[in-house]
Amino acid sequence: MQTKLSIFALSLSLAIPLHAAELDRAAAALAGTEAQFTQRFTPKGFKTAQVESGTVIFGTLPMMRWSYGRPEEKLFVFDGQHSWFYVPGDKQVTVTALDATRRSELPFLMIGDAAAREKNFVVRENARGPATMVTLQPRAASAMIRNVVITIASDSHLIQRVDYTDREGNQTSFELRGAHQRAVSNDLFHFTPPAGVQVVEQ
């Protein structure tokens, strides 16, 4: 995700270590909500982003269901222990076991895991107008994720945007909008592959 947020100057004097307080509130606020999202991926060295959009349903993190509608239909489902990635056009489902390393590479999973945040990242916050900017800097130089910036509405504690850069220099952003409460069940966060599709396990 691309971000031009410049927080480093302020962080030297104003940023304070955050013991997960704001992110814990944000994680709690997400539970049982549905929102529209726009994802932008900008490869290193490129100025034009690849844009995708759809809807996302959050259970208690790390349970999530990301339904992409444009430009291609695909589905990501997370139950906390596994993820399912289904592309109807390819007739293939990829099932991945989420170990600690994989979890640390997925910012939305870190938001809901206080212990993993403390272990893997230095967390700081800055109040910026009507929003709180939370930054996660990896403790390990070899970390896949280099920098995460989370924009949280100060009044509702809802996440508005997540930006991050990976160690290859690629930028990714998720913008959330139109969040509203909805009924959720555990069945939403489990995926049964349709008959006739190829299943790849990782």
Q: What feature does the model see in each segment?
A:
Residues 29, 58-60, 70, 142, ...:
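Short loop/turn positions at the edges of beta-strands in beta-sheet-rich folds
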Residues 4-17:
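Bacterial N-terminal signal peptides
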Residues 2, 50-52, 60, 70, ...:
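Residues that act as N-cap/strand-start positions at coil-to-secondary-structure junctions
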Residues 94, 116-202:
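Gly/Pro-enriched, hydrophobic low-complexity segments
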Residues 21-43, 47-49, 77, 86-146, ...:
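Flexible, processing/modification-adjacent segments and terminal tails
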Residues 51-53, 72, 79-80, 143-148, ...:
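Short, surface-exposed coil-to-beta transition loops
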Residues 53-105, 172-175:
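An acidic-aromatic
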